[in-house]
Amino acid sequence: MSKSRVCYCFFIFLISFSFNVYAESSFIDALTGGKIDFGIRLRYESVEDDSKASGNRDADALTNRTTLGYKTGSFHNVFAHIEFENVTDILDDTQYNDGENGLTALPVIADSRGTEINQAYLGLKFIDKTTIKIGRQALTPRKAPFHRFLGTVLWRQNWQTQDAVIVTNTSFKDTEIMVGYIWKNNTIFGTDRDMEAPIFNAKYDGFRYAKLEGYYYDLDFTESADLANASTTYGLRAHGVIPVINDKTKFIYTGEFARQSDTGSNSNSYDADYYLAEGGFKVKLNNFVTSILVKASYEVLETDKGTQGTVFRTPLATGHAYQGWTDNFLLTPAAGIEDTYFTMVATGKYDTKLIVSYHMLEAESAGFDYGDEIDIWLTRKLNKKYTVGLKYAVYDASSDAGNTKASDLSRFWAYVGYQY
């Protein structure tokens, strides 16, 4: 063999060896150079539910939520994320109904015990400004707490996730488009629900005083117990902030409309609407209270025929954020619901926040009131990693004839959390 051929072969070997070493090194770097996420939330919850029989109206729970996850770095535009979640009941879980233990005579505290894989997905970035995620993941097209149609139910200890393939693209200026397909909903109770659900969400932020969102969610639940939730929803949302007087005072607004109809094997034929209108002001201050937001809101979930099967429903939402924190209206009543409510958010120094809201809840298609609710939440962050909070919600039922929510209900929480 000639010296030139020997040199050539040796050169090819060197390149191949170097590439393999580099590839292996890059893979190891991506695998080990990721980010760990770790969180703990210890929480006490107390409930008084007058709809239960005497002697079974009070319930208490002390639970702890622990999450441990890891997101790898990118290797040839591929990355992965896995997260484990554990919910432990520190007291006796026979003191409340967690939604899975069968203690239906007791008030509900929806924090069931268990350990599970909360998220596990593969991410791909082969196309510019496009991310594909395949696997179990948290879907939140909107920032918390505005998860009206898709959310994680992040207030509960066991979060909701979806098994899905999701494509997100930001190629167009000021535009984010999300297209996906969900085949399984993993609930807060540790159970799952099969579905065939193409989804679409598009947001545009190019206007100075308005942000626009359009969406289409075709949630075809396929198991017999969930067929009433099979629905197609499409809608539009606009919200924005407009300076008034000076940059320290701003007008805030939101307007939203959605229409929903039955789909798949849902035996209930219906068409129902959703709409939201709200406006208020946010003012920046220069004392202990750094800002105050006040707003008035009006939200309606219609019923088509006055039956439970023909109401506007949101089965994948973070329902806790709507119609009051007592969770009395997670399922839209047969008569629909109108919620007129007022909210005050005060932000202070030392990462302190106070939220107070007052709800006036009425039937949408009948002439009676459900009741009123007052919600109060005080929270503070410490060193950016620790959070402490107190939260109280009380529902005062109306005595109107026909009221299907005629029992008083109150909840109290105290919690401390850590997030790394």
What do these predicted ranges mean?
Residues F13, N20-I36, K305-T318, W325-I337, ...:
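Outer-membrane beta-barrel biogenesis signature
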Residues S26-D49, H76-I82, T175:
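Transmembrane beta-strand segments of Gram-negative outer membrane beta-barrel proteins
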Residues D37-R41, R65-G69, Q119-G123, K133, ...:
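One-face residue pattern on beta-strands with alternating periodicity enriched for small/polar residues
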Residues D128-I132, T152-T307, F342, T347, ...:
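Signature for the C-terminal beta-barrel architecture of outer-membrane proteins
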